[in-house]
Amino acid sequence: MSMELFEVHEGKAKVLVPKAKTIYDSPVFYNPRMAPNRDVVVLLLNVLKPKIVLDALSATGIRGIRFALETPA
């Protein structure tokens, strides 16, 4: 089974997401409307500098990928 993919650029992250008519039709859930929320969380993590962060509701994993790329180790 082949899927048509498109590349999403968000912050420093680049991920491939299946094309779908709606976000609910895709086998992988990616909600582009939440990008501003992820931007704010990355900014907050850079200010608070927690030692551990959990992305418990991961779908595409973009939030966790951004945490890894855009916050201090």
Curated annotation (Swiss-Prot):
EC numbers: 2.1.1.216
Record-annotated Trm1 methyltransferase domain positions: 6-73
Coiled-coil blocks: none
SUPFAM superfamilies: S-adenosyl-L-methionine-dependent methyltransferases
Catalysed reactions, as listed in the record: guanosine(26) in tRNA + 2 S-adenosyl-L-methionine = N(2)-dimethylguanosine(26) in tRNA + 2 S-adenosyl-L-homocysteine + 2 H(+)
GO molecular function: tRNA (guanine(26)-N2)-dimethyltransferase activity; tRNA binding
Keywords, alphabetical: Methyltransferase, RNA-binding, S-adenosyl-L-methionine, Transferase, tRNA processing, tRNA-binding
Record GO biological process: tRNA N2-guanine methylation
Function: Dimethylates a single guanine residue at position 26 of a number of tRNAs using S-adenosyl-L-methionine as donor of the methyl groups.
Family according to the record: Belongs to the class I-like SAM-binding methyltransferase superfamily. Trm1 family.
Protein name, UniProt field: tRNA (guanine(26)-N(2))-dimethyltransferase
